[in-house]
A protein has these predicted regions:
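Beta/alpha (TIM)-barrel catalytic core signal, keyed to glycine-rich beta->alpha loops juxtaposed to Asp/Glu
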Residues: 1-151, 156
Length: 158
């Protein structure tokens, strides 16, 4: 916010986008960074939209992580595999399945439905993953569906 104010005051080139970690499991940015983007007209480019694979549907509570995956090898990412997150994942997966979609579809479509999101930064290791990521946001969530998703994976509180 301060950089935006200074840029306006001094007629500097303004920021046009911001990158923040943002997903259905990581919503802390909605308390500060996202409202600032909306206030200053900045586009948001969320990264880790699939929470390091947890929102793909391939990981399940109580199962070992795939050998070589981030969740198996890096302690930072293992911290995401909590009972609280798996409870959200299971509810979100059921929500998506009931509507004929995947958890991955929901993760991308939910981000695409956010007003300030201009694109999503997503990684892929196979051509199939690229295709799945590219087509996932085709699901246009209704206002009622967005409200239901918010109840299943609530915003972080300040």
């Amino acid at each position: 916010a301060e950089a935006e104010t200074k840029a306006k005051e001094h007629h500097f080139v303004r920021f046009i986008t911001a990158q923040n970690e943002w997903s259905l499991l990581k919503r802390e940015g909605e308390c500060d960074a996202i409202p600032a983007c909306e206030q200053y007209g900045l586009g948001q480019l969320p990264y880790f939209p699939l929470a390091s694979g947890l929102l793909t549907g391939k990981y399940h509570r109580g199962e070992a992580f795939a050998a070589g995956s981030r969740l198996a090898t890096l302690k930072f990412f293992q911290g995401w595999a909590t009972d609280e997150n798996f409870t959200k994942i299971e509810a979100l997966q059921a929500f998506a399945k009931k509507r004929g979609h995947t958890l991955l579809d929901l993760a991308f479509s939910w981000l695409a439905a956010q007003p300030c999101v201009v694109s999503v930064i997503a990684g892929a290791t196979t051509p199939e993953q690229v295709h799945a990521n590219a087509t996932a946001a085709n699901w246009k969530l209704s206002a009622a569906e967005l409200t239901e998703v918010d109840a299943l994976a609530p915003r972080a509180s300040v």
